[in-house]
């Protein structure tokens, strides 16, 4: 590796020749040789310190491409119980999000209909169940509306949305109910 070095006499000559540039310092363009520093190499045969996951491949699974459709957030989990749904809604309320219910009669899974661009927004439009629950402060109110929506549309997919009314965006959505046989 080549290194450019400037002697102090050269820097002094440059500074005398151009008084406007007297504060300039020569650039540092190389590193010192590594042979000047003592090096201790430690051999590490521990598999957990290796960057790859080669030792853990047997326990990793991916989403099976056949037979299972991907739904919204948390779709990899088994259906949530009422208590688990209440905890999710409590989380939305703690984050000052407005809960809202939406339902879809035909396609609750991810597909492309109105938009061909990749990404989360795939062109699906769900129907809103009533209005967003702006005054809601308890998860039992949301679960009550969920039960009403189930009775009105037993074959529909129903999702709960957390809406941020300050930023005017949907923050979270997840499937709260899948029709029987799906």
Curated annotation (Swiss-Prot):
Subcellular location: Plastid, Chloroplast
Source domain of life: Eukaryota
InterPro entries reported for this sequence: RuBisCO_ssu (IPR024681), RuBisCO_ssu_dom (IPR000894), RuBisCO_ssu_N (IPR024680), RuBisCO_ssu_sf (IPR036385)
Keyword Magnesium: no
CDD domains given in the database record: RuBisCO_small
Transit peptide start-stop: 1-58
Example of a GO cellular component annotation carried by this entry: chloroplast
Major localisation: plastid
Molecular-function GO term, any one: ribulose-bisphosphate carboxylase activity
Keyword annotations: Calvin cycle, Carbon dioxide fixation, Chloroplast, Photorespiration, Photosynthesis, Plastid, Transit peptide
GO biological process, any: photorespiration
Pfam families associated with the record: RbcS, RuBisCO_small
Subunit structure: Heterohexadecamer of 8 large and 8 small subunits.
Miscellaneous notes: The basic functional RuBisCO is composed of a large chain homodimer in a 'head-to-tail' conformation. In form I RuBisCO this homodimer is arranged in a barrel-like tetramer with the small subunits forming a tetrameric 'cap' on each end of the 'barrel'.
PANTHER family xref list: RIBULOSE BISPHOSPHATE CARBOXYLASE SMALL CHAIN 1, CHLOROPLASTIC (PTHR31262), RIBULOSE BISPHOSPHATE CARBOXYLASE SMALL SUBUNIT 1A, CHLOROPLASTIC-RELATED (PTHR31262:SF10)
Similarity comment: family membership: Belongs to the RuBisCO small chain family.
Function: RuBisCO catalyzes two reactions: the carboxylation of D-ribulose 1,5-bisphosphate, the primary event in carbon dioxide fixation, as well as the oxidative fragmentation of the pentose substrate. Both reactions occur simultaneously and in competition at the same active site. Although the small subunit is not catalytic it is essential for maximal activity.
This protein's name: Ribulose bisphosphate carboxylase small subunit, chloroplastic
Encoding gene, per UniProt annotation: RBCS
């Amino acid at each position: 590796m080549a290194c450019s070095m400037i002697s102090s006499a050269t820097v002094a000559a440059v500074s005398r020749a151009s008084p406007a540039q007297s504060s300039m310092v020569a650039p540092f363009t190389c590193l010192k040789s590594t042979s000047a520093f003592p090096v201790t190499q430690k051999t590490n045969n521990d598999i957990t310190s290796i960057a790859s996951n080669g030792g853990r491949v047997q326990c990793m699974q991916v989403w099976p491409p056949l037979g299972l459709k991907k739904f919204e957030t948390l779709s990899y989990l088994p259906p949530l119980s009422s208590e688990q749904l209440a905890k999710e809604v409590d989380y939305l309320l703690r984050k000052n999000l407005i809960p809202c219910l939406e339902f879809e009669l035909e396609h609750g899974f991810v597909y492309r209909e109105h938009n061909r661009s990749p990404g989360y927004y795939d062109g699906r439009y769900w129907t809103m169940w009533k209005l967003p629950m702006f005054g809601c402060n308890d998860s039992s109110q949301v679960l009550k509306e969920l039960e009403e929506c189930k009775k009105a549309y037993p074959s529909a997919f129903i999702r709960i949305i957390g809406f941020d009314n300050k930023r005017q965006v949907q923050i979270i959505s997840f499937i709260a109910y899948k029709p029987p046989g799906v």
